[in-house]
Amino acid sequence: MKDGKMTALAISSTALGFVLLATHATGVGVALDKVRAAAFGHAPQDQQQQVMLEQTFPVGAGGTLVIDVRDADVRVTTAAGGQSSVTVLAEARDQDWARQVFERMRFEVGVSGTTLTVRAHDPDIRSEEWREHRGVSMTVRVAIPNRFDVRITTADGDVEVGDIEGAVQLRTSDGDVQLGNVTGSASVTTSDGDVTAGDITGGVEFRTSDGDVHVGVVSGPAIVLQSSDGDIDAGTLAAEKITVRTQDGDIVLASVAGELDAAVGDGDVTVRFAKAAPASITAGDGDIAVSADGAFGFDLDLSGGDVSVPRGMVVQGTVSSRGARGTVNGGGPLIRVRSGDGSVVVNLPGAR
């Protein structure tokens, strides 16, 4: 048996060598495809996609979409119209195996009133089955009118939702989430993945345990952006209460209008205020930079490894290389900044 393994290895190595020698003649892309084929026994084009389910329903604007699938990617598109449709696609090398997996998932698709529901169960595939047949990728595609509420839950898969007017709730245990522009509230939770969204009106709660958070212009009564391990960057944030936290990553907030509570364990923080509002900004080990769009009045309480304010910025109080406390432009909401081992730079334009 050992000799057989060595012979197979020699054949694979020889095939791999011929593929690499062919690189100059056939191009890098073709050679890489052949390398994959030699290493794994199939080429990328062996993957085939087939439609497993396709249905259309008379559910127009103002409805609700509920999706609960165990192991599949979810893609939701929106457009003007009075109908909704559901398509389930399977991508695999073995089409018979793909059909078996689909049947094991026991998809349930139906309408009750104005609620369109898509549910699927865990296919319960054993490890030896995966080794024999290789993987199967399931995708649930749903098309709905622009004005719709959306609730999606998946245990393992990416989630994409286009522009929509309505409340959005997205949950995935393992996958990235992409969300378009939303007129309504948006709540997103993923245990392992990035969260990316456009402009949102209605409030936001985005949480990821391991991934970055990227948002555009967001407004509403409250905004929460949180990551345990990842960067957070946002365009304009406008709310009564804004909470931004990450344990390991940078925070960049281009424009803030509202009470801010920002904290990072290990990373830098950059904040620009669009109006005067209370703020607490903390970095365990990182630099903090604070600026403002105008000559707003603030109370300052700054502390860090190296604290600095620009020349000409008048602070009524005390300023040293380790901290500053006082008022700017007659005083106003308190900006409290703390960095355990990093620089703190505050630059308030017009505060001269």
Feature names for model-found ranges:
Residues 1-352:
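Intrinsically disordered, low-complexity terminal regions
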